[in-house]
Amino acid sequence: MGTLFLLPSVLISLTCISYIYTAEIANGYDFKILRRVTTNRHDFDLLIFTQQWPATACKEWKKKDHSHSCSMPPKVDSWSIHGIWPTKLGEMGPSFCNRTWLFDPEQIRPIEDQLESVWVNIFAGTSLYSLWSHEWTKHGTCAAVLDKFNSEFKYFSMGLEWLQQYSMSNILQSNNIVPSNTQQYAIEDINKAVKEKLGVDPVIECKKEDGENYISEIRICFTKDLKITNCDGVLFPVVYSNIDGESILTNCDKSMKVTYPHYVSTSWTVHLHSLLSWLRWLTL
C-alpha cells in the first residue's frame, strides 16, 4: 500500500503510488491538479495522440446496431480527436491509474465548446461527457504524472493544441488525399504524406468491412517531454508492413487500397432517394 500523506489539501492512498491534490487558479477557474510524489509501475515511455476519422467511426457504431445513429462534428470531413494515451513500449497501457480521480465536467467548462467541435462523442444517444470521461479516467489519470497533463483542463487543452498543430485533415489534403466515396488511396501514399510532413513514423489503423479497408485512425507519438517521435515499438494490432522497401506501421491490408470515406447523412440519402423517385414519376 502506498504511503499515506496527511496534508491540508486532500488525503489520498493508492496502491503502489501516492499523489497529492493541490489547486491552481487559471482564468478565474479553480483547477484540481495532481502532484506526483512517487513513481511506480504506471510509468510509460510515450504519449500517443490519436485522431479518428468520424465517417468510419460512425460506420462502425451503426454496424454494432442498426438502430444506432451518429452525432457528427460540425465539419464532418475533418479529423477529430480520440485521445492522448500514455504507453509503455511493447505493452498495452498503463490505464486507469487513479480510479478515485473522477471526471468533473466543471474542470473543462472554459473549453467545452471547442471540445464539442473537435473531440466529439459520435455515439448519439450516449452522454455528451461519456467519451471525455472515459479518456480522462483511462488515460488522463496516467498522463497526469507529467506537469503538462496534471489536470483535466491541461489534458484536454493539449489535445486541442496538438490537433491544431498536427491536423491530419490538413496533412492529407496538402498531398491531394481527400475524402471520397469513389476514389481510393494506397496505404504507402497516406503514410508518406504524414511522414514527409512530420518526419516520424505514424500508426495507421483501418477497419475492414465489405471487403474494403476503411481508414479509421492515425496516431502520432511524443516523448514525455512532448517532442514528436517515431511510434516504433508501440503494441497495438499493428503489422510492420514492408511495402516497396518502406516499413509502415499499420493493420491495413496492404493488398488493397484504402477507402477514405466522405460522410453522407442518412437523412440526405433518404431525401435524395425521394427526389429521384419524384423525378422518375414526372417522366412517366
Predicted regions and their residues:
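Cleaved targeting-peptide boundary
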Residues: 21-32
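Cleavable N-terminal signal peptides of Sec/SRP-targeted secreted and luminal proteins
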Residues: 3-22
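A positional/structural detector of protein chain ends, strongest at the extreme C-terminus
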Residues: 1-4, 282-284
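C-terminal, well-folded lobe of enzymatic/effector domains
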Residues: 23, 115-116, 120-284
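Betabetaalpha-Me/HNH-type nuclease active-site subdomain
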Residues: 32-125, 197
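Beta-sheet entry/capping signal
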Residues: 6-9, 45-47, 78, 219
